[in-house]
Every structure is written in structure tokens, then in C-alpha cells.
Amino acid sequence: MEADAPAGYRDPSGRHGAVTLPARPEPIAFDADATVLIVVDMQNAYATKGGYLDLAGFDVSATGPVIERIARAVAAARAAGIRVVWFQNGWDPDYVEAGGPGSPNWHKSNALKTMRRRPEMNQRLLAKGTWDYALVDALTPEPGDIVLPKPRYSGFYNTPLDSMLRARGIRTLVFTGIATNVCVESTLRDGYHREYFGIVLADATHQAGPPALQEGALRNIETFFGWVSDVAAFEAALSSDEARRIPA
């Protein structure tokens, strides 16, 4: 392989993808038809005042621009023929899927701990069918998109994601959403261990907690598990690929 070749999946002949995305720690190439854009947990719970994160004491005041940039990434992906996968984190209204005291999730989930501390919140936080569980109004799945519920941080845990990706020949996962340091990183890590190439569009993500957690998560990803880029670079790379495919 050439020293200056981009990272990314190569087919048996050694050909890398047609789209090259500037990224850290190096550019990465992918084919649009072997890529999905994953939107992680853009629910009222995580991105809206009065949602779970806000009620649990996390700052959600900066999520507006993130939502706008995710909308741009979704539009660019759809225009390039990249399928969009939406995740919604949560459980049934009785929280059976959340696990009881025998599950570490029962002890570590801030949503469950908030409801135990504030019983009036019970069956309101991250319960399927509630406002908290719903995607934010500005981001709407369209026909052809994939919408998956997930009961834990990783989108690979107890979901059909892996089989759905493999059935479609997907090799590259482009991530947006909340929270960078929790569900985004957890899903990207699990994808890495399943031989998927993971890319995070940093300015289309937001952390749960102080800004240092965003910086740390992105540094961890680019050093050990994947690649980090941004929405403008993603749009430009896809536009360049589209221009190359249009006959003169």
C-alpha cells in the first residue's frame, strides 16, 4: 500500500473507496454505497430543555447548532445515496428492558437514578411513546431510513444493526449525535471490534458533561478506534465525488 494512501476499507484488488474525507489522524476513503450515516439518540431526552439530560443536571444549552449540523450531514448523505440510520435509546414504559438491580445499567443509568430520586419522573424519562423518547422535531426520518431502538449505550447491543449492515455490504460508519463520550463512542468502539471503519463528525456531536469530555472522547477515538472529521469536510467530499460521477 502506498505510503500516502488514505485509510479505509480496500477490496480484494486493493482499491480504496471513491470518496476521500479529510480527517484526523489521516484521510479516510469510502464508497457511498458501502457507508451509512448513524444519528445517535437525537431525542428530546438528550437535546432539549426539560429532557432527561437537562433534568439530570447536564448542560444541553449548546445542542441547537449541533442539531443544525446533523441536519446538514443527513441531507448530504441522502443526496449521495448514503443510507441514514437513526437510534433511539430507551426502554418499555415499565422499564423491564432497563434491567433491575442485577444489571449494572440499573446502577449507572442517570435516567434511572433520576427517577428513583424523583418518583414524579417515573415513566417519563426515556420511556417509549413519551415526548422524552421522541426524536427532536428538527430531525425526521424519511422512507428508506432505518430507525432502531436500543436498550443500552452501544447500538450493537441487543439490536439487529450488525446483521442489517452486513446484509447491505456496509464497511464504513459515519457518526453524529449525542453523547459523544457515551453512546457515540460506545457504538463506534463496538463497530471497530466488528471490523467496521468508524468516523465521527465532531461538530455534529455533543458530550454529556463538561467540554473536556468531548475533547477526551474525540482524542481517544482518533488515537485508538477511528477517525475524526467535520460536517463541512463531509459535505465537500461527497460533493466532489458527485461531480466526478456526472458525465461532462
Curated annotation (Swiss-Prot):
It is an enzyme of class 3 (hydrolase). Gene3D superfamilies: Isochorismatase-like. This is Ureidoacrylate amidohydrolase RutB. GO terms for molecular function: hydrolase activity, acting on carbon-nitrogen (but not peptide) bonds, in linear amides. Keywords: Hydrolase. It comes from the Bacteria. One of its GO terms (biological process) is uracil catabolic process. Hydrolyzes ureidoacrylate to form aminoacrylate and carbamate. The carbamate hydrolyzes spontaneously, thereby releasing one of the nitrogen atoms of the pyrimidine ring as ammonia and one of its carbon atoms as CO2. It catalyses: (Z)-3-ureidoacrylate + H2O + H(+) = (Z)-3-aminoacrylate + NH4(+) + CO2; (Z)-3-ureidoacrylate + H2O = (Z)-3-aminoacrylate + carbamate + H(+); (Z)-2-methylureidoacrylate + H2O + H(+) = (Z)-2-methylaminoacrylate + NH4(+) + CO2. InterPro entries: Isochorismatase-like_dom, Isochorismatase-like_hydrls, Isochorismatase-like_sf, RutB. It comes from Methylorubrum extorquens (strain DSM 6343 / CIP 106787 / DM4). Belongs to the isochorismatase family. RutB subfamily. The active site is at 41 (proton acceptor), 150, 183 (nucleophile). Its EC number is 3.5.1.110.
